[in-house]
Amino acid sequence: MSNSRLMTIDRFNKLTGHETLHPLICMVDLSRTNLNEDIRMMCDFYGLLYYNDPEQDKISGKEWLRLIYPGETVEIPLNRHRHTGCCSGVLFHPDLLCDTSLENRIETYPKRCCCKGTLSEHERNIITDNLREIGEELHHAIDRYSASIIASHIELLLNYCIRFCNQ
């Protein structure tokens, strides 16, 4: 098991073999990695992970959303990132939120929001569409609007996830 000290965005990208497009945020798609061991990380960032294994979902409803807060230790077992699109999400450093509306609201989100169950196709599409929008903004040249736009997308995604977890 990869057991790091404090996991940063850059360290996470290096561990998973992804390029760091922005020092304060990264997209997670563990289906595109060459990991050969479990990941155990103490985070210095916020995050939202979405896990969906289409094969297992039919059998046991293994699908979840999880909010991550700085200081949490997160484990991602190897078998969770062996299927296409099974573990995706976004990780973002608190500094990304500076001078955005989300900076003041982030602490209002539940510290332990994790929903397990089957999401509807519509709910899955909302999650993947929001993640795609964040990823597209990361590929745009960084300018003075970048953090605000990304934070807005993250806030929308978090609000939807809270809704889905409370249904």
Question: What spans do the regions from the language model cover?
Answer:
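Surface-exposed loop/turn and secondary-structure junction residues enriched for glycine/proline
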Residues: 12-15, 99-100, 122
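Amphipathic alpha-helical segments enriched in hydrophobic/aromatic residues interleaved with Lys/Arg
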Residues: 109-156, 160, 164
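Short, intrinsically disordered, charge-balanced linker/junction segments flanking boundaries
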Residues: 49, 165-167
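Generic surface-pattern signal
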Residues: 14-17, 102, 132, 136-139
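N-terminal regulatory/effector-sensing and dimerization cores
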Residues: 21-112, 143, 147
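A short, N-terminal "cap"/entry segment at the start of jelly-roll beta-barrel domains
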Residues: 1-21
